[in-house]
Amino acid sequence: VAGAARHAAKCLALGFAVAGPRWRDNATMHPDHDTILAATQTWLTRAVIGLNLCPFAKAVHVKNQIRYKISQATTPEALLEDLIAELTLLRDTDPEVVDTTLLVHPDILGDFMDYNDFLDVVDAAVEELELDGILQVASFHPDYQFSGTEPDDIDNFSNRSPYPTLHLIRESSIEQAVQAFPDASDIYETNIQTLRKLGHEGWQKLWQLGSDKA
């Protein structure tokens, strides 16, 4: 759990710490690509943008600069291959075309502790590709839990997503965002206040509105 919090801090600094509904990864369900994509985009539009949990997200969403990659990996090794491919693609792609990537992997690492352990592999991949200072990876999971919290604490929802997800971020985009929003360091606390005020009941009502389209 502590390791997960360390990785989450990267994303929290950007203010992209968002709450996700309690969808759970279940490999036996084998949700199709469209279902996974729709759930992820609904999470983005309602939590990240709709609750203004990330002031920076709306622009890249409107400009269609977010890449959604639904991994079919069923082993950590296959997921690592997808991660390396996506890191390389993001590195080599014009930010005006793809600014950030959400690598969603519904059929692997559904257990949060396994996911947490895999984050060390993620760090090693970034280092091996010599992308330190260029790209970073933040973490989201349906059962995300910060150290020192109870599983159902609303604070944990700041990093809960429909499916296990790795968020690939450009360091340059973080720098630009922080310059554009001088109070960026306060976003995490603001998000926690928003979630606590909303509460579990309010959160559940938010997800009873049906599906969104990207």
Predicted features along the sequence, with ranges:
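Expand to "…catalyze enediolate/carbanion chemistry for C-C bond making/breaking, isomerization
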Residues: 29-214
